[in-house]
C-alpha cells in the first residue's frame, strides 16, 4: 500500500512543521514506511553520489512496510479503532500527549504573532516554557495566556515604546509571569476554544479520540496523567 507524497496532501498532519518532520523521520528510521521506487525523480537528489538513498522526505511516495494478514480488513480495523493504550505504557502515552500539547501551543503562539505582524522563531526556550506551563494549565487555558501576552506586546509596539523585534521578544517572559501569578493566586483561567484558522491536526484528533479515548479533554485538561 502506498502513501502519497506529503507535499501533495491537504491533510494537516501535526500542529507544527517541526513535529511533522520528526514524525516522518521516526517512521523512516523504524522502517514503518519505505521509499517507493515509483517515486518521482525530482523527489531525489539526483546529483548526489548517494542517489537514490538521498531524498526529499515530503516529495517521495512511501510504501507501508507492514505484514498484512490474509484478511486485510482486520488490520485496517485495528489501525482505525486501536486498543494501543494500556497502563504499562502510561508514561509513553503521557509523553506523546505533552509533545502534541506543546506543538499546539507553539502553533497558536506563532499564529497570533503573525497576525499582529511580528516575526518570531520558536526555539528551545519556547518549547521548555510551554512544557512547564502544561504542568498546571491546559492548552485551552494557555491559548488565553498567549492571547494576553501578544496583545500586551502589540500595545507596547503601537505606543512606540518598543520596536517590533523587542516587543515580540517580551511575549515568552509575559506568558511565564502571567502563568505564575495565576498559579500563585489560584485564578481560574478562561478556557479558549480552538479557532477555525487552526483546525485540529490529524495526529491530535486520532491520538485523543481514538488512542487515549479522551476526546476534547486532550485540549481542555492539563497533560498530567492518563
Regions found by a protein language model. Name each.
Residues 1-226:
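Basic, alpha-helical nucleic-acid-binding regions used in initiation and control of genome expression
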